[in-house]
Amino acid sequence: MRTDKSFNDICYSCDETEDPMNREKRLFDDFSKKLTNISKKSKGWNDILQNVPLEEINKREDLSKLPITRKSNLSKIQKSFPLYGGLTIKDDKEFKYCFSSPGEIYEPGDSGDFWNMANCLYAAGMRKGDLVYNTFSYHLGPAGIMMSNAANEIGCSVIPGGVGNTDIQLEVLNYTKPSFYIGTPSFLKILL
């Protein structure tokens, strides 16, 4: 989280209130160099970007020059170069988590707010010291850990409820009285 004099209690990060022109400049400064670096360090991205003039990707409009990698192709790419299709710039075993998603797709995960979800939870009103009840699954998919890590980043304690065991979950909810629920609307309806 970046903080400076313009930081206020409404925004989690000063990036949210940054002048749009400054943000655009910051986002695209050295963008082509970053893409080139990723392409050099990642076999998967090197294959995908091999016919793209990376030095020409310097502003938002240039993003249309990049090929789209469809989710339906990701499984095939990953099978040809396990675990993550060569689409990371560090060794696959260096990540803290290896998630599996439907369609035989594997996703890396790391500690902290790896998915940058803290901004969303903060915008929803979550603050340091809140007790959060997280009913997203912690089994194979990333949602449970994704939300827990984001809430922890803000300074919240998390009850990792997951799904199922409704009777036990109701006991926990009644005893702990969390200030936030994270999960699907359908499971919330069951709990209510």
Give the location of each predicted region.
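Short, flexible loop segments at the rims of nucleotide/cofactor-binding pockets, characterized by
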Residues: 15, 109-111, 136, 156-161
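Alpha-helix N-cap/helix-start capping motif
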Residues: 42-43, 163, 185-186
